[in-house]
From Swiss-Prot:
Protein name as catalogued: UPF0280 protein Mlab_0453
Organism: Methanocorpusculum labreanum (strain ATCC 43576 / DSM 4855 / Z)
HAMAP family xref list: UPF0280
InterPro entries for the chain: ApbE-like_sf, MA1715-like, UPF0280
Signal peptide region: none
Family under the similarity heading: Belongs to the UPF0280 family.
SUPFAM superfamilies linked: ApbE-like
Length: 236
């Protein structure tokens, strides 16, 4: 298996693939998606700055329309979905090249399809459980988004307290947006109430860590003991 770091402007990723041609396809897909977003932002700067949902016209690039739709479902700004959207474009390009396996980690937002079982580590910063467990992901023919937001790890803006909130969806942009939105508001006390808002969404599972508290909702994959290497985490 090939593991290659790839950075383009502020996009910093790790690509996993079986063939170098699939890696190149992923790079091309991500560059095209990011370029589409950048060009659109020149025409609508508010799309980049808003912390609230923003619509996009039908003739906007597909990446922009995905981000806009995700912002409305999760009630966040559209840029909350940019990382997974770019990752999705790269993974989709790998599929189109004929790959049976592809994974892109864009700063903790993972998009994949796979013909094999995978382990995705759970990193939650200072939380006691951090780095000790992994999600056991069964083979996935459909693209899957596993997106994590944190108030204690990384440079992203968060208004919450969670060490990590991970959302699972076959719409990666919406997994990314929901992870951000939930991380902004989740506490151990309101978890069950907040999950009722997720029930009708595109997200089918949520795993949240706040200190020594862990919240689980939905159809989570099996969680197994693991040693998560910090060096394998994609970061700027």
């Amino acid at each position: 298996m090939i593991r290659e770091k790839f950075a383009y402007r502020e996009t910093i990723t790790t690509i996993l693939a079986d063939d170098t041609s699939h890696v190149e396809a992923a790079k091309g897909g991500m560059i095209a998606a990011r370029t589409g977003v950048e060009e659109y932002l020149l025409t609508d700067p508010f799309f980049q700055m808003s912390y609230s949902p923003v619509s996009a016209p039908a003739d906007a690039p597909e990446s922009v329309r995905c981000m806009a739709a995700a912002s409305f479902e999760a009630d966040v700004g559209p840029m909350a979905a940019v990382a997974a959207t770019i990752g999705w474009a790269g993974v989709k390009a790998m599929q189109n090249r004929g790959a049976a396996f592809g994974l892109i980690d864009n700063g903790g937002d993972i998009v994949l399809f796979s013909n094999r079982e995978l382990r995705v580590g759970i990193y939650a910063g200072p939380a006691p459980s951090s780095g000790k467990f992994a999600f056991l992901i069964t083979p996935q023919t459909e693209i899957l988004g596993i997106c994590t937001s944190s108030a204690t790890v990384g440079p992203s803006v968060s208004f919450g307290i969670a060490d990590s909130v991970t959302c699972f969806s076959h719409d990666p942009a919406k997994a990314d947006a929901w992870a951000t939105g939930l991380c902004n508001i989740l506490t151990p006390e309101n978890f069950d109430k907040v999950m009722k808002k997720v029930e009708e969404s595109s997200v089918f599972a949520v795993y949240a860590v706040i200190g020594d508290w862990i919240g689980r909702w939905g159809d989570l994959p099996e969680i197994v003991p693991a040693h998560v290497s910090y060096d394998l985490i994609t970061k700027g």
